[in-house]
Amino acid sequence: MEFPFITEHKTFGDDRGNFSPSPLYMKHDQRLDKHWVQVNTSISPLIYTIRGLHFQLEPFEQAKYLKVVSGKIFQFVMCVDKTHFDFGKTYVFEVDKDHAVMVPRGYANGLITMEPNTVIQYFVDSPYSPQHEKSMLYSSVEEFDTFVKNYTENPHLSEKDRDGFLWEDYKKTL
């Protein structure tokens, strides 16, 4: 069984700017050695922007490797696989440009930006499928909700994320 984890993803800089390699073949760590099929970029101009919690259902479940290109986030990863003994457990990671987080299949992923103009790049091992995508309301997950309330009363959310289902309702469907 796989679990989420944070790893170094170094950015190198000099007077010309920065360079950050993102190898598609990550043999240096077998946990990262996936068949990545798509690379996505997310740009959040506003601080306290919330994305997620998102996941996809079979047969389009996704493992994700998320790297912050610029800015800083707190990432929330929650096991939504009822067959996993980690079911319902939430992990929280502070992620900046020198780190990345591996999110295995069977986990929902959400984040809050802690700086304006945050750019995130993420690799996925299955293509995006709107018909299989699920969005869970962040405030229905106690750790995520408490964290957000410590920083802001007015986070920025998309309509889709604002209309996400509740964690308690999801558990009843299993």
Locations of regions flagged by a protein language model:
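Compact nucleic-acid interaction/catalytic patches
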Residues: 120
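Conserved metal-binding segment of the jelly-roll/cupin
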Residues: 94-117
